[in-house]
């Protein structure tokens, strides 16, 4: 059996992207691509190359909160940029959002992983992203 995952693009506009991710674990753990930049709408013919995390709201209910949800910039070696546990909201809009580190082999995509989980652990994560286009 596998984790039950719902990953939805709520809004894909010229400048903003809103995603909704929900998982109920069966104890197997999972990694899900929550942003696939190659599938995003373009803006005046320009292709989205990456995104910045502008705001995130989440409710994470896990047995091992020390190793809860990890958000990662996809690269040759993924870069963890946010760890989520409990119920909170973060707003990074005052400085333009959390920027992709563009590590070696970066794709612009964003992964979310539930590394240490027990049967019934769950999480809901809603993100507002700023789209960054090729020059």
Please provide the spans of the model-predicted regions.
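An anionic, turn-rich surface loop/hairpin at beta-sheet edges
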Residues: 78-99
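Noncatalytic modules at the cell exterior or secretory-pathway interfaces
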Residues: 96-122
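Short amphipathic beta-strand/extended segments with alternating polar/hydrophobic composition
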Residues: 33-37, 80-86, 126-128
């Amino acid at each position: 059996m596998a984790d039950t995952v719902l990953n939805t693009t709520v809004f894909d506009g010229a400048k903003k992207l809103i995603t909704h991710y929900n998982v109920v674990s069966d104890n197997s753990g999972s990694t899900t691509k929550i942003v696939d930049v190659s599938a995003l709408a373009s803006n005046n013919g320009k292709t989205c190359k990456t995104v910045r995390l502008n705001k995130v709201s989440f409710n994470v209910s896990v047995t091992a909160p020390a190793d809860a949800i990890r958000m990662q910039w996809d690269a040759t070696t993924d870069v963890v940029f946010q760890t989520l546990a409990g119920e909170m909201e973060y707003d990074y809009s005052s400085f333009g959002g959390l920027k992709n580190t563009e590590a070696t082999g970066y794709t612009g995509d964003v992964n979310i992983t539930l590394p240490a989980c027990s049967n019934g652990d769950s999480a809901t994560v809603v993100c507002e992203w700023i789209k960054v286009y090729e020059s």
